[in-house]
From Swiss-Prot:
Naturally occurring in which organism (per UniProt): Homo sapiens
Keyword line: Cell projection, Cilium, Cytoplasm, Cytoskeleton, Flagellum
Gene Ontology biological process terms, A to Z: flagellated sperm motility
Record protein name field: Tektin bundle-interacting protein 1
Quaternary context: Microtubule inner protein component of sperm flagellar doublet microtubules.
Principal place of residence: cytoplasm
Length: 209
């Protein structure tokens, strides 16, 4: 009973006012995790202010955070130049942060950790292997029936040996509708019946004199 009275006499501090988890310092490149379904990594964008004399405007200076690379072609959102041996500064920096967690895990859990931690809806998951993956599924270009190109649906996988039409690319000659050629002098002006595949008899037109 006396213990309860002593605890009641203490000043109560709401837990919401206490900073339990201290944020990463601005000069740090440590990867933080965004709260969500996949907990993707993120780097706090550190914005510093240059020291300026009194009375002058301070210019904002964006410091290096790790998501950018020294080479613009090797940015994190671009595909690597050499798919067999890609080198990503941001990926290597992220992998070094999570490498200590992968040492005590099986290979299946390690793969799941990479997919969930380095998740981006635009680019596939970053793997050292040249095989392309999208999430946990291996991406392969398979001929799916009904999903080929509409222009040459019946000629899927067959390259035409002759030059295709300039109006609609890769459109086969029997399916080319009349009036799609660039030369209007070759247009057939006679009426055509698609059901009977016949043309109407030529009508008598007065010849100009």
């Amino acid at each position: 009973m006396q213990t309860l009275r002593q605890e009641a006499a203490r000043p109560c501090i709401p837990s919401g006012t206490l900073e339990a988890s201290f944020p990463a310092p601005l000069y740090s490149d440590d990867y933080l995790s965004l709260e969500g379904s996949r907990w993707p990594p993120a780097i706090r964008q550190a914005t510093r202010w240059k020291y300026t004399p009194m009375g002058r405007d301070a210019a904002g200076q964006l410091w290096y955070t790790g998501l950018t690379n020294s080479d613009a072609w090797e940015a994190w959102y671009n595909l690597p130049r050499a798919p067999a041996s890609p080198f990503r500064e941001a990926y290597n920096r992220w992998h070094s942060c999570y490498q200590h967690r992968e040492c005590s895990m099986p290979s299946a859990y390690t793969q799941h950790l990479r997919e969930t931690a380095w998740h981006d809806p635009i680019v596939p998951a970053q793997y050292q292997a040249p095989s392309t993956r999208w999430g946990s599924a291996l991406w392969k270009d398979r001929p799916i029936r009904g999903k080929e190109y509409v222009l040459n649906r019946n000629r899927y996988g067959v390259e035409p040996l002759w030059r295709a039409s300039d109006y609609v690319p890769s459109l086969s000659a029997p399916q080319r509708p009349p009036g799609t050629t660039q030369n209007y002098r070759e247009w057939v002006l006679e009426p055509y019946c698609p059901s009977t595949c016949q043309r109407s008899p030529p009508s008598l037109t007065p010849t100009p004199r």
